[in-house]
Amino acid sequence: MNVHGCPRIAACRCTDTHPRGRPAFAYRWFVPKTTRAQPGRLSSRFWRLLGASTEKNRSRSLADVTASAEYDKEAADLSDEKLRKAAGLLNLDDLAESADIPQFLAIAREAAERRTGLRPFDVQLLGALRMLAGDVIEMATGEGKTLAGAIAAAGYALAGRHVHVVTINDYLARRDAEWMGPLLDAMGLTVGWITADSTPDERRTAYDRDVTYASVNEIGFDVLRDQLVTDVNDLVSPNPDVALIDEADSVLVDEALVPLVLAGTTHRETPRLEIIRLVAELVGDKDADEYFATDSDNRNVHLTEHGARKVEKALGGIDLYSEEHVGTTLTEVNVALHAHVLLQRDVHYIVRDDAVHLINASRGRIAQLQRWPDGLQAAVEAKEGIETTETGEVLDTITVQALINRYATVCGMTGTALAAGEQLRQFYQLGVSPIPPNKPNIREDEADRVYITTAAKNDGIVEHITEVHQRGQPVLVGTRDVAESEELHERLVRRGVPAVVLNAKNDAEEARVIAEAGKYGAVTVSTQMAGRGTDIRLGGSDEADHDRVAELGGLHVVGTGRHHTERLDNQLRGRAGRQGDPGSSVFFSSWEDDVVAANLDHNKLPMATDENGRIVSPRTGSLLDHAQRVAEGRLLDVHANTWRYNQLIAQQRAIIVERRNTLLRTVTAREELAELAPKRYEELSDKVSEERLETICRQIMLYHLDRGWADHLAYLADIRESIHLRALGRQNPLDEFHRMAVDAFASLAADAIEAAQQTFETANVLDHEPGLDLSKLARPTSTWTYMVNDNPLSDDTLSALSLPGVFR
């Protein structure tokens, strides 16, 4: 234990004497020893810039991996029972300094080989140690992150910690738990998994295991559902301890600000159809450009003065910008405009089985259980002629970022951590450890082929794929959206190329399609490859044609355009050249691509082309890199600005959760109501048992606390819909949001306690049994969970407002 009373591991979350998320020992000044150069080694200065652990800590990990080889024979000579017993005898309580780490690695290597048939490479053991040090590791596709993660999970569990291996979907949670379960069992550890189909009892059992595999959604939904229970025995989610996150950049960056929502039945009205229809007419009008305008990167849309006048006239001559309508009618109009102008079918969503399904842009597949904020969801459904779905009342919500920050220790793994290093450091205080490949990467990455127009680019892509296919080399094509993937697929088929397509419309087939993408002559067209979870092996899943395909150059990756972040490009490139196999990649771009149009001055772009419309300037690569850096900077700003809004809500939620736990687990509710209403308490004490009276008091206090929090969330949602309009009055929207949120929260506690006192004093005494009639404290008859793809509010400043101590 360190001076903070926390295990000396890299995710100690104490804030009083050292930065949150980094251990005190990580901030001592070290003079690195001069050591022999290691594969993939970076300078210590570069490590510090990345927020990564010190050079000494990395050197210690390398030394431990080397030392573990001395124990390999001893581990191999142990029976299964003795191997399990040896694992249990390890002293790993102090993971940062334990002398038993080499023995642990040797036991883990032997257990993995016996139970999974996989013998971990040294780089996998190094990756496991860096995760045990609290870092996010970067390991290339095909290098064995799943096994490295299981070994790290075993290390934490043997140190007495409870580990949640956080995945991006249910399929990977169950697959990895069943795949790695025998390894953990061989080391005397228990493993469980959770999916959307798991019952409450199955969830409790899984969480009770040493290591639990579950998707980030399911973990979050369990946390939310626990905020409705009125009996401590109904709780499902345990206290958070260690989160080991697979595809860490996807979970911690791409989806960090996605709110997970618990909703209940309600009778709230949906947005007015007359406004949705009116906006549809505006957008479809031949003079539509006169009625609304979008910004340069198509992220925002607003009415022009002419458009506002037309809407006002159609709605009976109202003033959209009056106090009466600015926060209601104008907001509805803007939401409907967003649905009709900015959100495109087969790009942002698809329609299947008479329902709108969102597409996860970073994964290229349907975003399960995800929806837009209720007004926008209804507007899109109306746009597509689909019956509006029930919205419900938000009972509780938590962002993925706030969910993960609950854990005492956070670490993870991904193929593209370095590019997300800034966000990981800024929002989670996490370092990044790049892990060298087991075999040198010999993939050849060709310079971008840039065209003057999208049409010329698409022609070039089809010609290139056809040419590569004719020699039998397998091709993986990464597109940016569903519409593009289907259009390209159709063109290839017309050219006689037997391509298969993998996108959000057929993601159920993804494992089979990806597994065969390395076969001789295969052409696979796919939307984003992040988190697909299946390796592409040369020669197909059985590698029957491995040598033949390798001689042709291995898998050839084609990107149909740069993404807004380099990470997504690298995730696609990384599919080629796994485990030392040959491979190649090339990206096609045009001056009309979104990332270029939004981030470069069109008048300064070189325009000289060859006969096929390809730009001949040597500056194209640097210009594309610059456009991508600008786009990444904007995304970071959006993350930071949105975080500033969500952070206050997260802090308020933490106060509510603490108060709720106190009411749920102690006699506080009974004591407070006895003090507030002594006569009624004395009256009831003579009629009901102390245990029954305690239950009644707890139910009353919890109901009004939950009711107050749900009302507070609804109020904050209403504020956020129109807070940006405060800028018209020269007010800072963020400052105003914080002021209003803090003022409202300050009265929440008093109002909840006052309402509880009133219920306690006025509820009728039951005739047929001892107790009070609490039928008016009706909770939702049904609840459901989903994710909200929220539109981030943007602002440039953060005002530090303190939270009042509302509960004493």
From Swiss-Prot:
Its EC number is 7.4.2.8. One of its GO terms (biological process) is protein import. GO terms for molecular function: ATP binding; ATP hydrolysis activity; protein transmembrane transporter activity; protein-exporting ATPase activity. It is an enzyme of class 7 (translocase). ATP binds at residues 124, 142-146, 535. It is found in: Cell membrane; Cytoplasm. GO terms for cellular component: cell envelope Sec protein transport complex; cytosol; peptidoglycan-based cell wall; plasma membrane. Pfam families: P-loop_SecA, SecA_DEAD, SecA_PP_bind, SecA_SW. Its main location: membrane. The keyword Hydrolase does not apply. It comes from the Bacteria. It is a peripheral membrane protein. The keyword Cell membrane applies. It catalyses: ATP + H2O + cellular proteinSide 1 = ADP + phosphate + cellular proteinSide 2. Keywords: ATP-binding, Cell membrane, Cytoplasm, Membrane, Nucleotide-binding, Protein transport, Translocase, Translocation, Transport. Belongs to the SecA family. Monomer and homodimer. Part of the essential Sec protein translocation apparatus which comprises SecA, SecYEG and auxiliary proteins SecDF. Other proteins may also be involved. Part of the Sec protein translocase complex. Interacts with the SecYEG preprotein conducting channel. Has a central role in coupling the hydrolysis of ATP to the transfer of proteins into and across the cell membrane, serving as an ATP-driven molecular motor driving the stepwise translocation of polypeptide chains across the membrane. HAMAP family: SecA (MF_01382). This is Protein translocase subunit SecA 2. It comes from Mycobacterium tuberculosis (strain ATCC 25618 / H37Rv). The gene is secA2.
